[in-house]
């Protein structure tokens, strides 16, 4: 077949999975319309659903949060760790720096910037573990808890679906980026059955819910940075304008594809992030930042199990439901998307390399940024240089972040850099989301090909419309509720993926139960 024919075949409409695409996109558009037309009703029902889920299943979310680390550790250090996603002599498709950069910028986004500065202030106002607000202990724990919420657990949750999907792509050489194909051991044989279609639709809606949450946090952040930098008015019109700019940016990147779009944005963003972190460390209270970070390492290691399983059953103060369970739900909602994206860029790496790379480099990146950003805002609050808690109570999270950054030397320069960083961070996240959503809605997609461009652009527009609907519905709690609700059906799907992976490993490598680990590159015989 000629190159031209292959190209035409790659983008022909017949490859679109019409049932998954149209049902999913229609659902997203209808929900967006309902949130826009009936914002108060949408907010009430979303928060009721979140309260019911966290009340009845909060304990379950906390237990689920422990499983990814255990399972990923077994994969990395067990007999299957040296299995390679590719042939024996195949090199990684992307350099380690680009690979880590794409994973980090696609997964954490500018939410890390927003929460890095704001989350500690929430915790000194409403501390965990029965601690007195604004006490010395509250300040110490306010620096530790963000590291816990953004550390090993979320990256392990992202890693969990990555391995079965990469195995499916590069060992079985399945021409698909559908989650349903990685759950085949528990699904009917017929791929066009209702079960396969429903599973992919649930995944799409879960991904959209997780991404919409990030947009709900990110748009006000970028707007506040622009207000501080340019002096424009902070209102709904400005927020919608930011969404439109964003949609154009990541829609263009999604149109360009993986290597020309996402990789370029990720490379730029990693460089900018290191610049911001170095500037905070050098221009900020260096000794204080080093001391509080060292202190937090000890607190974290000494209390990790307590934080992981703390349900607050006696006092019932609501901290686990409002924070830990919310975060675990957020990461779960994002997990299928991140698993698909991480797997797609992990060709040529071993299972052990992928697991350690995702959890190790990812956790290190969030640890460094949260230690510096959180330490800096706590320094300002604790030394009466900025009443961050008052700004949080009266104006909200986004204006607080802008004001904290404005306290650094050369505020105009650093505000400009952080604004650009935030824009690209989110553009990379939603670019990846549009790419993955389009892939799920595509039939028979080989690992070396990309989904139809207009399919990708359609999802970029869909995400932008959902963001506008969520902004009109308004409210921090509404955004959080969206995450928790969308995450619940994803949990059994991830369990199905893990079961299928173990089934594949036992079937394809029976010799590993008797002999020392070997490297297997060839697809198993059918």
PLM feature spans:
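Loop-to-transmembrane helix boundary motifs in multi-pass membrane proteins
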Residues: 13-28, 188-197, 232-251, 255, ...
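Flexible loop linkers connecting adjacent transmembrane helices
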Residues: 2-11, 44-50, 77-96, 121-145, ...
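Membrane-interface loop-to-helix entry segments
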Residues: 54-57, 64, 199, 203-207, ...
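Extracellular/periplasmic helix-exit of transmembrane alpha-helices
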Residues: 115-129, 173, 280-303, 363-396
């Amino acid at each position: 077949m000629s190159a031209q024919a292959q190209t035409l075949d790659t983008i022909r409409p017949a490859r679109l999975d019409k049932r998954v695409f149209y049902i999913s996109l229609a659902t997203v558009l209808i929900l967006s319309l309902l949130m826009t037309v009936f914002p108060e009703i949408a907010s009430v029902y979303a928060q009721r659903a979140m309260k019911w889920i966290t009340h009845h299943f909060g304990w379950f979310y906390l237990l689920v949060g422990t499983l990814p680390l255990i399972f990923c550790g077994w994969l990395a250090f067990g007999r299957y760790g040296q299995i390679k996603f590719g042939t024996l002599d195949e090199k990684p498709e992307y350099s380690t720096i680009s690979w880590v950069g794409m994973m980090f910028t696609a997964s954490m986004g500018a939410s890390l910037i927003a929460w890095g500065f704001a989350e500690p202030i929430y915790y000194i106002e409403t501390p965990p573990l029965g601690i007195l607000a604004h006490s010395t202990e509250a300040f110490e724990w306010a620096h530790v808890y963000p590291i816990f919420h953004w550390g090993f657990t979320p990256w392990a949750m992202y890693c969990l679906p990555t391995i079965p999907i990469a195995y499916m792509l590069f060992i079985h050489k399945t021409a698909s980026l559908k989650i349903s194909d990685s759950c085949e051991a528990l699904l009917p044989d017929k791929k066009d059955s209702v079960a396969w279609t429903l599973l992919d639709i649930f995944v799409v809606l879960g991904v959209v819910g997780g991404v919409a949450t990030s947009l709900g946090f990110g748009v006000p952040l970028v707007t506040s940075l622009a207000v501080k930098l340019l002096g424009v008015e902070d209102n709904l019109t400005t927020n919608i304008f930011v969404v439109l700019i964003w949609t154009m940016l990541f829609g263009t990147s999604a149109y360009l594809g993986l290597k020309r779009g996402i990789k370029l944005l990720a490379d730029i963003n990693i460089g900018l992030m290191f610049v911001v972190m170095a500037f905070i460390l050098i221009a900020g209270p260096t000794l204080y930042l080093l001391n509080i970070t060292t202190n937090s390492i000890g607190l974290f290691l000494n209390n990790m199990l307590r934080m992981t399983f703390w349900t607050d059953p006696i006092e019932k103060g609501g901290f686990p439901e409002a924070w830990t369970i919310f975060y675990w739900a957020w990461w779960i909602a994002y997990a299928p998307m991140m698993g698909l994206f991480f797997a797609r860029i992990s060709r040529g790496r071993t299972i052990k390399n992928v697991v350690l790379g995702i959890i190790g480099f990812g956790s290190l990146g969030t640890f460094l940024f949260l230690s510096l950003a959180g330490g800096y805002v706590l320094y300002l609050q604790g030394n009466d240089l900025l009443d961050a808690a008052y700004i949080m109570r009266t104006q909200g999270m986004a204006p607080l972040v802008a004001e904290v950054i404005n306290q650094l030397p050369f505020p105009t320069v650093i505000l400009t850099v952080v604004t650009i960083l935030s824009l690209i961070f989110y553009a990379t996240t939603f670019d990846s989301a549009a790419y993955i959503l389009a892939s799920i809605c595509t039939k028979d997609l080989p690992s070396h090909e990309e989904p139809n461009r207009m399919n990708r652009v359609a999802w970029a527009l869909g995400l932008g419309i959902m963001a506008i609907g969520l902004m009109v519905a308004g409210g921090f709690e509404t955004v959080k509720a969206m995450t928790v609700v969308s995450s619940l059906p994803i949990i059994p799907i991830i369990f199905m993926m893990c079961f299928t992976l173990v089934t594949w490993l036992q079937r394809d490598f029976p010799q590993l139960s008797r002999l020392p680990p070997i490297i297997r590159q060839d697809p198993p015989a059918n």
